[in-house]
Amino acid sequence: MSLNPSRPSSSELVELHVFYVPEGSWNYKLNTISIEVINNFISAGFIRVSPQLTLQALRERLGEFLGVDAVAEKFLFLKCIGNNLAVVKEKQESELKLKSFAPPYALQPELYLLPVIDHLGNVYSASTVNLDEQQSVDDTMEIDGTIHRPDSLSLSKDEPGDPSLLENTWRDFPNHEEAEESQPTQQHFGNPRLPGSLEESDDCLGNVKSPFLWKNNDEDEGEEDDKATINRRQAKLVCDKEHSALPDLIDFPSFPSQRVSSRLVDTSLLKIEREKIIEQMKQVKEERKYLENIREELIKKVEKLFEQSKSKRYHACDSWKKKYFDTKKVTASLEEVLTKLREDLELYYKKLLMQLEAREIKMRPRNLANISDSKNYLIIQITEVQHAIDQLKRKLDTDKMKLILEVKMRKQAASDLQTLRADLTQKKMGTPFRSPIFSGSVPT
């Protein structure tokens, strides 16, 4: 396609960042790549071009923008469709303009290029790219401004997958003029005046999906491209009937052997790492089992000690209760005897006072002056004081008994509180056993 002679102003130009897909990232099986790995692409620089410029025209001038060293010899344009990058075909290169690679038509002003891998000299593999989708410079000869191609390019049906046959065919290509049995080979690519058999052969090769790409350096005019397209479509029907096909991708793999060896090394390393992880997991499981056994043994010891302490508390509490109730039974009879003795003592005290008072009355007329100094009066005072002392002693004994009982009750309450705290601690730790609560209520 011819370029527009009128150069646009700088304000009308768009800036595009050019990226190369690194080797090994392209998915040759699906013939695509996800946009998630765009961050791993290799930058080739940026260009300022007209948004109306087509990809076909940019292919011819890309070396001027980025430099010959920065541009790959053979490459394909990629376009972002959804979440993946797809290959742009040759026919689409003449239709797509650079404005479709910049906002608002695209998320980012970026242009992606896929270098084509060289395996058999002039033969290039790019998965399922057709002959119409890519041109190769090394596969054609330019003489006096015209493109020449051998008419014996189609392979034999008996050997469709032999790469040596194809390689030998291209080795004999420079000497095709010396062969007497071959047909005239000078022809202009896409000329509608070509012989029918040669045009059908070329179009058949162009419509069959193959891993081989051919480069055409001739810039055809728009009308000639349309005529060539019509001729290729007409010859496609003849090609389908003849069932002529090129070798499959299996005969010419696109992946180098170094990549396969690196994958094997990576696989072996992954296996080694997996075995190490499995060994570590086994060791961790064994350590866990050992620690669980130790934990079970410690729990059993704690339960045993807890049972022993619980039995000691039960025994002490039971013995104390037994002594208390036995003492209480004996105390009941003793209290009855004590009450009776106290009553007798009170009666005896009252009788003694009555006798002393009667004696005092009889002796009063004789000793009116020394009543306070009489012997009988002193005896009465001594008896009253002795009675008061006895009452104080009895009160002291009663208070002492109450104090002893209260001390014992406080000790029992402190023991119960300690037991409750131990139970609460066990519950917080989540132990399966639980200590009982002893309520030592002693009747008074």
Curated annotation (Swiss-Prot):
Q: Which domain of life is it from?
A: Eukaryota
What Pfam families is this protein classified in?
Answer: SPATA1_C
- Sections of the chain in a coiled coil: 268-403
Q: What is its main location?
A: cytoplasm
- The answer on whether this UniProt entry bears the keyword Flavoprotein reads no
The cellular component terms of Gene Ontology attached to this UniProt record, alphabetical and capped at eight, are:
acrosomal vesicle; cytoplasmic vesicle
Spell out the protein name for this chain: Spermatogenesis-associated protein 1
Name the source organism: Rattus norvegicus
